[in-house]
């Protein structure tokens, strides 16, 4: 029911702000701007769904080969000791373990194109165990909130954007560690929030061992990149690692399929058909969500909020540099492309190496696009009652935002 009220209030807030602008400033174009944005977002939603068809068919085709080759079962057995504690509803060795692990791994490496198909497959697997098909299960909520926290090891696209902006950042990779800290804080917050709600004990030895091990690996990788590699080498390493792993996954699935005497071509076609069906199924959910977000954005709601915050912090004599980057943080839960545009606008206006420019990049890398994730993932399996998933995601996003601000002042503050 939370999504119902949020969707409604997006329109109410946008209309109230637009009406205020028209009455106070006499802006005759505000309603035209909002209406044009509505129709553009509706068309963009359909275009986005069609763009997803190719990616979905590709990865679900290979995923089907991997399942028949036994790769997903192997991955499920590997992570079962850890995931069985976080997802107690799932039976041992369930395929959903492997699908979720593939999704988290793709997210970790910044492989958005791969993460979405793997995540949708995970939701489909979890839905088979869901007793109430229109209400999100505990396992689905845990998966969604962890996914939306957006734990990413190497923010490749953000580094590339900082390098390509005019003028470019002197050191595009200097936001690497701050991004890692912010997104890690958001993920830990997401895990803690849902675990408290679902009464999961995070102090179990297995959970502590896995979280400690993952934290150690991340720390060692960060140390290696910062101590032994130059800026150019870091960018090269990131590109080779992320793209090389995609090809390696495909090769492992194909080799495993041939070894198991699976007809890999027919298996690919069989799995790929599901990608088309899912992409078409999510169109209504995407249209509904992206139109509501467009209404809020084109009404000027973000400018209204940031101007108000700047006045409040100035009144108390506090530093307001971070406020200039807040539009990126506010847009990120709503729209990935919108927040990316906000980040570019901030870097163009203030400079890529300015405090606001760097902080906007950290905001962009600190979490995933919450409402897009809700629309696509829950929409793909027909979930209508998302229960407490949205408040949990937004709270984790808030932790990521606050952490990003503190980290930015720690690394780049004057």
Map each language-model feature to its residues.
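Hydrophobic core segments of alpha-helical transmembrane domains in multi-pass membrane transport
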Residues: 7-22, 56-64, 149-152, 156-160, ...
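Membrane-embedded alpha-helical segments and adjacent helix-loop junctions characteristic
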Residues: 31-128, 231, 260-349
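Short hydrophobic/aromatic segments of transmembrane alpha-helices and their interfaces
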Residues: 97, 134-137, 247-248, 322, ...
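Alpha-helical transmembrane segments of multi-pass membrane proteins, especially transporters
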Residues: 6, 10, 32, 69, ...
